[in-house]
Amino acid sequence: MKKSVKSLSLLLALIFILGLATGCSQESTAKVEPKTLKVGVTAGPHAEVMDVVKKIAEKDGLKIEVIEFNDYIQPNVALNQGDIDVNSFQHKPYLDNIIKDRSYDLVTVGNTVIFPMGIYTSKLKNIADLQTGATVAIPNDPTNGGRALLLLEKIGVIKLKPGVGIKAAVTDIIENPKKIVIKELDAAQIPRSLADMDIAAINTNYAITAGLVPTKDAIFMEDSNSPYTNIVVVRAKDKENPAVQKLIKAYHSAEVKTFIQEHFKGSVIAAW
């Protein structure tokens, strides 16, 4: 009889302990919040597209907090320091240059869009009207500056040293028949300086933010074969993070591609 009572007591104690454990487990599970990613973007099209991605990702249990930046420098600084988890604003040549200069441990996890760079003017009807001694604005960061110089070469304004490619710098100009004066400015500031320039090479995201319509206002644009595809970037240790993979899945959805096609009408091109 004593054995039976003792066995029953042990059984009841075990059931009680298991009940507590189950309750704690359920309580713990109930407190788990959906994963949130802080995603850094530049104002304009990158932010607009990410707002669409955000809504799609939320259906998959992923919350995205969009953090807007006003230049090309801080999004990588913030990502490297851990202030944000992801950024989406730059192309691969620009990232490669930043990694080389600053030794950031950052990697690409997916393609996003292409923003064709354009040549803009408030003074000329076409590039043939460009006068000797004209003032030309290009971005002052090495990658986009090189991109702008290649564009100027393509329209016949300058000639560069053979083989310099995307690493072209102003010092690589070997022919400048119109003796143009090149002003290297912060990419985000160039649209505001357009009235003071004869022509300017402007990144599409900043052109749109300034109220320009690339397909209408640019007198020349890069084509879809541009090597400057924009990318999603994370710290190397987060490359396989499931939340990051959910972000890429949402970005590469049919809904996002349709939004890009209908909203930007060719000024921005989906690159996946």
Name each model feature, range by range.
Residues 1-36, 272:
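Short, low-complexity disordered leader/linker segments with a strong preference
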Residues 32-44, 62-68, 135-136:
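Short, well-ordered beta-strand elements
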Residues 44, 70-72, 82, 86-96, ...:
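Beta->alpha turn/N-cap motifs
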Residues 67-77, 164-192:
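Short helix-initiation/N-cap motifs at beta->coil->alpha
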Residues 97-109, 122-124, 196, 201, ...:
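Ligand-binding "clamshell"
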Residues 109-158, 257:
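A conserved helix-loop-strand patch within extracytoplasmic ligand-binding domains
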Residues 116-127, 229-241:
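A bilobed periplasmic-binding-protein/Venus flytrap-type ligand-binding module shared by bacterial periplasmic
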Residues 144-153, 251-271:
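Periplasmic-binding protein-like
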